[in-house]
């Protein structure tokens, strides 16, 4: 089996505009305020879009983006190369909120992460069996993993009653409602969704 680069984990720190390839370079006194994580191609793209929304609106919030390529019954990674508990703390910190979008059932990921540090702080959203959908964005929204769902949950996790953050959460709900209305009326996603320019990391 081919070894996954960096254990199949991609890390980007927004406040440094930097990819992290050496986990030993992560400093405990330079931690993010929150973490956006994803496993699965479509939900990762949506998480990247959520990061872009947040960077535009609340650039002062330090956000770590994490993509997890491989999961197994033992944890993050493969059976041969599973992420250790100490490396998990380096990457996911001890106590920062984690918003995790998953391409499978949320309870599956919850059981995989159970033995890692402080799993109660990890908000997981994944596949839910909810009726028929009209467009890709509609499907993401029904599963609560759209960019606006992720951005709203991220702000709620650090808002501490901040009025600006709370008004932005309402704005994200409105943007989502507008995008869904367009999708259901036209059977295609709105241009701002369809033509989104995703952040490039390479």
Label every model-predicted segment.
Residues 1-202:
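Thiamine diphosphate
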């Amino acid at each position: 089996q081919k070894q996954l680069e960096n254990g199949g984990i991609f890390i980007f720190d927004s406040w440094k505009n930097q990819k992290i390839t050496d986990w030993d370079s992560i400093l405990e006194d330079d931690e993010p305020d929150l973490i956006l994580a994803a496993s699965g191609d479509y939900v990762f793209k949506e998480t990247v879009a959520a990061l872009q929304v947040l960077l535009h609106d609340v650039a002062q919030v330090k956000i770590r983006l994490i993509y997890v390529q491989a999961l197994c019954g033992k944890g993050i990674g493969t059976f041969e190369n599973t992420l250790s508990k100490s490396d998990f703390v380096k990457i996911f910190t001890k106590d920062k909120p984690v918003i995790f979008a998953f391409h499978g059932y949320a309870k599956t990921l919850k059981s995989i992460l159970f033995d890692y540090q402080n799993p109660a702080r990890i908000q997981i959203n994944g596949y839910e069996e909810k009726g028929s959908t009209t467009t890709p964005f509609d499907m993401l929204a029904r599963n609560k993993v759209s960019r606006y769902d992720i951005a709203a949950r991220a702000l709620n996790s650090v808002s501490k009653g901040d009025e600006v953050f709370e008004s932005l959460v309402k704005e994200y709900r409105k943007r989502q409602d507008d995008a869904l209305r367009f999708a259901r009326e036209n059977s295609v996603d709105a241009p701002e969704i369809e033509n989104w320019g995703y952040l490039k990391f390479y």
